[in-house]
Curated annotation (Swiss-Prot):
Keyword set, alphabetical order: Glycoprotein, Seed storage protein, Signal, Storage protein, Vacuole
Name this polypeptide is given: Phaseolin
Range of residues in the leader sequence: 1-21
Organism the protein comes from: Phaseolus lunatus (Lima bean)
Keyword Signal: yes
Keyword flag Nucleotide-binding: no
Comp. bias intervals (Basic residues): 414-423
Cupin type-1 domain residues: 35-193, 228-383
Taxonomic placement: Eukaryota, Viridiplantae, Streptophyta, Embryophyta, Tracheophyta
Amino acid sequence: RRVPLLLLGILFLASLSASFAISLREHNESQDNPFYFSSDNSWQTLFKNQYGHIRVLQRFDQRSERLQNLEDYRLVEFMSKPETLLLPQQADAEFLLVVRSGSALLALVKPGGTIIYSLKQQDTLKIPAGTIFFLINPENNEDLRIIKLAMTVNNPQIQDFFLSSTEAQQSYLYGFSKHILDASFNSPIEKINRLLFAEEGRQEGVIVNIGSDLIQELSRHAKSSSRKSLDHNSLDISNEWGNLTDIVYNSLDVLLTYVEIKEGGLFVPHYNSKAIVILVVEEGVAKVELVGPKREKESLELETYRADVSEGDVFVIPAAFPFAIKAISNVNFTSFGINANNNYRIFLTGKGGPTGKEDNIISAGINPDVLGLMFPGSGEDVQKLFNNQNLSHFVNGSYHKNAHPHEQEQQKQQKGRKGAFVY
């Protein structure tokens, strides 16, 4: 089973050539690119007022049959103005949240008591399903932006349950009969209606403005422990062209990754052995190239999916599909890897040498004699080519030397060949 995967990776390398368009079918950021979600038309606004908004990305499984394995996952964006509160709620989903910018006070109301976390940019936290929580932007001059991966418990939709009624949202308590309510609260229904459900005094929405005194009171009880951060103190990969930080949430089977690429840098061709990656652009502009097989009528061919991505865009990368990212400007993004346990990043190019973390898998793992059987060049020359890069993972994305005419002719001859086996 490894051979088709390896061949797919090798063929991806050819896609970076000058005559790329000749040998592979391409999809740009248009309607027929199932992996690209534009920030302009892929987000649905659930709530919006002068204090902030809540948006959810289009369902992955409704976008393409290729994304059916993501039917239980949704991406949620939250933004709030300074000194605001997202009213207490719970949901039939687990959340893994990342603070994109600003700071937050996040309160989790549990049977054993309430825990308030102080979160800064790039901090992450898991909210268990059914946990009542509320969220505060304590700053007086900076917006709070959060991205959440939601993992549903009751398929297929996710439902937020708010304790209180607003002009935009009804309290779920209101759904109970008066006999249930008066017995549960040990109070007459008139009092319950006046205190909980009266229209007078209702908030306009689920994001409201609050005073500095309440913020100071909650801040005194907040703690920063038991949360994880994607900050620079925990870098896993770093060089002059970029850096990467990973956090694995084993209980959720999710890999959370933060990547920064310098302008002109290239995140070299690689793939994830098992994880399906949901990439969310935080800042900057980049080009994404993804190569995968597609069945079209009775023929098989490789297809290239390209997109120029910027802030708010989302790109999904299926497991084992090779891809590369080139930074047009300084760019950073967060990604959620689904099926993360026992996942490996397989780099197809990069620094060669003895087997180790810095190596690409081709030069480190394939015998030169085998390389000679795989490619037109000699095994020794092919191995030297794969070892020619002096950096790993992040490299200079520009190479200006023109291809030799004979090399261009060889590239043209690749037209019409089939891609990976699909079965």
